[in-house]
């Protein structure tokens, strides 16, 4: 595991310990059970069935590698813009320390539209899955680089029991081999190396031959132009998680439409 990832995971464990003090497990279970759910898997499949790219549009203020991406950051407005311009789902960063995200941002974005929402964070404990449901998430991300396989399998099973869809993220073939032991149909290939934060979309293109036909590839990070989209679609990839390109645009939803539709 990288120094950066090590640091993030250590902070996550500190945050979970503190959260358990302020919101005990049983209290969080009550909050989680009160939330309705939206069909994350169905929203992506519906786009495919209609012959369109399925875009998971990200609400992200900043990143460790790029700094602040959007100074005027209003999650509700961004979510509405995405919904109006053809996004299938939202992804909202909830990590505060490294990405300047917030659970409030997820709640605000979800309340502003009818799209299903992925909680984008570094999940290392089942408590975070209850947090995700309590804040209104419909799906969560499991990062293979941050988890051993038995824990990843256990977290997926618990997520599904809570009604959360799962996107498992990999960056290399070793991680892919482990990720394919999960049941989720969605395999995210992160074009950004979490060890170095270097990015190339060739990462996705170079791993496609190892993905079984019953899995849906989600290409993540580094999709910055219409040309990038066309390269992916020519290779048979039709599901995208995009944040930076939209966040840097004056109108995020209009940029989504320009790149994809």
Swiss-Prot record:
Pathway: Amino-acid biosynthesis; L-tryptophan biosynthesis; L-tryptophan from chorismate: step 4/5. Keywords: Amino-acid biosynthesis, Aromatic amino acid biosynthesis, Decarboxylase, Lyase, Tryptophan biosynthesis. It catalyses: 1-(2-carboxyphenylamino)-1-deoxy-D-ribulose 5-phosphate + H(+) = (1S,2R)-1-C-(indol-3-yl)glycerol 3-phosphate + CO2 + H2O. HAMAP family: IGPS_B. Belongs to the TrpC family. GO terms for biological process: L-tryptophan biosynthetic process. It is an enzyme of class 4 (lyase). One of its GO terms (molecular function) is indole-3-glycerol-phosphate synthase activity. It holds the Pfam family IGPS. Transmembrane segments: none annotated. Its EC number is 4.1.1.48. PROSITE patterns: IGPS. It comes from the Bacteria. The keyword Isomerase does not apply. PANTHER family: INDOLE-3-GLYCEROL-PHOSPHATE SYNTHASE, TRYPTOPHAN BIOSYNTHESIS PROTEIN. This is Indole-3-glycerol phosphate synthase.
């Amino acid at each position: 595991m990288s120094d950066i990832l090590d640091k993030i995971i250590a902070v996550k464990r500190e945050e979970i310990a503190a959260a358990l003090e302020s919101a005990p497990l049983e209290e969080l279970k009550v909050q989680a059970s009160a939330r309705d759910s939206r069909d994350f898997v169905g929203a992506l499949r519906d786009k495919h069935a209609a012959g369109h790219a399925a875009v998971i549009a990200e609400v992200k203020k900043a990143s460790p590698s790029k700094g602040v991406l959007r100074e005027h950051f209003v999650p509700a407005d961004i979510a509405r813009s995405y919904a109006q311009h053809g996004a299938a789902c939202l992804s909202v960063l909830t990590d505060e320390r490294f990405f300047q995200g917030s659970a409030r941002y997820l709640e605000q974005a979800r309340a502003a539209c009818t799209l299903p929402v992925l909680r984008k964070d570094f999940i290392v404990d089942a408590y975070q899955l209850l947090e995700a449901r309590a804040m209104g998430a419909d799906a969560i991300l499991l990062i293979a680089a941050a988890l051993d396989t038995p824990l990843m399998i256990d977290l997926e099973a618990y997520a599904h029991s809570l009604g959360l869809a799962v996107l498992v993220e990999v960056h290399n073939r070793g991680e892919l081999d482990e990720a394919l032991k999960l049941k989720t149909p969605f395999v995210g290939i992160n074009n950004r190396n979490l060890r170095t934060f270097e990015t190339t979309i060739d990462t996705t293109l170079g791993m496609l031959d190892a993905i079984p036909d019953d899995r849906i590839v989600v290409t993540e990070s580094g999709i910055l132009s219409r040309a990038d989209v066309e390269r992916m679609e020519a290779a048979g990839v039709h599901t995208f998680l995009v944040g930076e390109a939209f966040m840097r645009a004056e109108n995020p939803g209009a940029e989504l439409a320009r790149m994809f539709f």
